[in-house]
């Protein structure tokens, strides 16, 4: 189920694409994804075009995220990679600092695009393996982390993100 509010055509479709990814992931992946990966992928679905009765997603045209990334970098507010892959959205939202929120989301978007696209797709096979293994529940996790990854009724805690995010990034 999904509740949608009309916040203007572009923003409404952006929110539907983003939240639609979360619903898809929640339904079809055995393991939930670490926050940087889940949010990074969700932002790939925020920009779409409609032509001949079909919607097409175009991650490269997500100008709001690209603008936020540019602003983050220009202001020197970027997160270190180790911090980014170990952070959860709740942590940055709790700071009540717009720059921290912008940094987390825009850098997660950029990191996922980098893994998919950089160097003519050099890392895309490992990126796909990371997703495939998450979908099948085959990540090399200890029993507690595996239980949290699999049981959507358990909260994805800050500690889980701190352990699992970096572990998966290094593994894949």
Predicted regions located by residue number:
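Juxtacatalytic substrate-recognition/specificity segment
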Residues: 1-34, 49, 140, 156
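Acidic/His/Gly-enriched intrinsically disordered linker/tail segments
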Residues: 29-172
